[in-house]
Structures are given as C-alpha cells and as structure tokens.
Amino acid sequence: MKRLVIITVGKTHSGKTTFAKELEKELPNSFIMDQDNQAEFINTHYEKLQPTEGSNILKHGLSKFIVDYAKEHTNLHLIICNSNRSKNGRFYLLNEVFPQNEYIRILVHFAIPDDVLYERVGLSKRSTNIFRGNYSSFKEVLHRQQVKLLHEDVVDPIENGADYLFVIRNSKDVNSTILKIVHLAKEFSPTPK
C-alpha cells in the first residue's frame, strides 16, 4: 500500500487551491499542504522574522516540518498545493521528499492561458497577506512569474517526470482529473475492510 502525493504546478490564480480543496473533499484520508497558509501565518504572527529578500527560509522550514510530520506520524495522502514551477524544485520533491518506492507521485499541471489569469487577478478578492517584499498585488506576482519563464529552471512538467501527469487547461478538466486521482487512490492504497 502506497500513499499518494499530488503536487500542483501552475501560476498564481490558475486554480491550484480550488482544485486542492475539491480533491481533499473527494479523496478520503488526505490533507492539503499549501505554503500560502504558512506565509499568511508568518506575516500575521511573526512578521519581524520574515526575511525581506533572498530565500524564504522560515516559510520553507515551516512547510518542511509540516510535511515531515505528516509523513512520519500519519497515513494521509498529501496534496502539495504550491506553484512548483521550478524543475529543480520538483525534482527535489519527487526524488528526495517523496521517493517512488514509498509514494505514488502525481503532478497536476495547470496550463491556463495567460489572458484568463490576468482576468482572474484583476477580479481577485484574495488576501495579499501572503506577500513578502515589495509586492502589492497578484498582478505583480503574475508579471514576475511571466518574467521567470525566461529562466531555464522554470519549465512545464513532462511525461515521466512523476508516476502520473495530468494537465488542466480549463475548469472543465478539473472534475475528470479529480475522479482519476480518486481512482488511483483506490487502486494503489485500498481502504482496509
């Protein structure tokens, strides 16, 4: 019996969190690990400890602690809901944190067109309390993510990068992807009778 780890890949406002919440409802014995929650917690309660530039060590450390705890002390499936757009970052997650001999590793790539994303950020009511540094809007975050496409490490996931890859191009793909993942959970980690 293997646990599933579902890792989202996509830009801001591509639907990762909405997808993760819907998946959690349908996938018994799972939880969402979303770094936006850690960012908001740190900005609310420990703002003075938040680094203003460079690596976000505090947020990543808190996230790692939560994931390690879930791995060692629960039998929950993990839904890792972050942008995960860095090829090296995904490689680390898939090979170091969630090795193939212990987990069924699933990538869900949100390939939503940029015009849709810009429309969504324009209408967004989400809290900006997850930001650090000079960001004041999700439009700025999306613009930065566009610029990062020029870096060789920011690439779309490919087949064989994980055990399974699902691509969501629009909201119509969400339900069928959730059903496929739930089916995989039943196949690889059946509930004890």
Regions found by a protein language model. Give the residues of each.
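Small-molecule kinase domains that catalyze NTP-dependent phosphoryl transfer to phosphate-bearing small molecules
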Residues: S127-I178
